[in-house]
């Protein structure tokens, strides 16, 4: 089975299992509470719409849009045309970590953003490979799909955390037996919801990792000769992140690694070779939103070799 067909099969399987698991758990919860199913469905749709509408403004803060004529915009425009999707709006983000991301909706316009540190550490080929990955997310509607599948675990998680916090507060300040029992009940229900959230997140994260791999697949098949550059881009991001020093109390970056082009290129190539020969457990990234870098690099090179 080739890489593309395998990814599509696994995405169908993981997506189906995620929807079934979320459906069963939601049905059990609303049945116990006694809320009509139709009201629950309407409530979820409204929440999804609110999230869909406001997310671009939250994600897009601290960004600056670039337009036609800007080199970054022209790269994205070329990739979008070859991917057969409308050109998204293009932004430079002034976040402190090297990253690129796709976001937006049909009202605000689909968007692609690249952080300034990423622009500083990648060469032209690596940047094109990364942007092809992000355009792949837009082509595959990953923003909308990911938001929909993540909605139910998010709601259950918020309710669970609220009950746990309230339960502990009641226990701490309990003035009589009723408040003590109520606090214990909230802790018990909150604990159950926490476990359910964790289990659902396992499914959602599995699906998310496959969508990331599918975006890698889009980049590597659109520009097959640039697959190694996506690998070195991942390595440079990893190296940069490992060398960032942050304040342990505020999380603010104290120092970031200086950009040394020759050393950066050599270190990235060495890390890619390490990943290619590294044995990774199937469960190494079970709690991660993205596949382990070694898995991503191995897939990219398998596409390059036509296996």
Curated annotation (Swiss-Prot):
Family listed:
Belongs to the peptidase M48B family.
GO terms for CC? plasma membrane
This protein's membrane topology, according to the annotation, is: Multi-pass membrane protein
Q: Which keywords does the record carry?
A: Cell membrane, Hydrolase, Membrane, Metal-binding, Metalloprotease, Protease, Transmembrane, Transmembrane helix, Zinc
Q: Which residues form the active site?
A: 134
A molecular function (GO) held by this record is: zinc ion binding
- Cofactor section: Zn(2+)
Where does the signal peptide begin and end?
none
Q: Where in the cell is it found?
A: Cell membrane
InterPro entries membership:
HtpX_protease, Pept_M48_protease_HtpX, Peptidase_M48
Query: Can you tell which superkingdom this protein's organism belongs to?
Result: Archaea
Q: Mainly localized where?
A: membrane
Task: Give the binding site residues for Zn(2+).
Answer: 133, 137, 212
Q: Where are the transmembrane segments?
A: 7-27, 38-60, 145-165, 180-200
Q: Specify the protein name.
A: Protease HtpX homolog 1
* Protease recorded as keyword: yes
Q: How is the cofactor bound?
A: Binds 1 zinc ion per subunit.
Q: Name one GO biological process term.
A: proteolysis
EC number(s) per entry:
3.4.24.-
Enzyme class of the recorded protein, top EC level = hydrolase
Which Pfam family name is an example for this entry?
A: Peptidase_M48
Q: Is Oxidoreductase set as a keyword in this record?
A: no
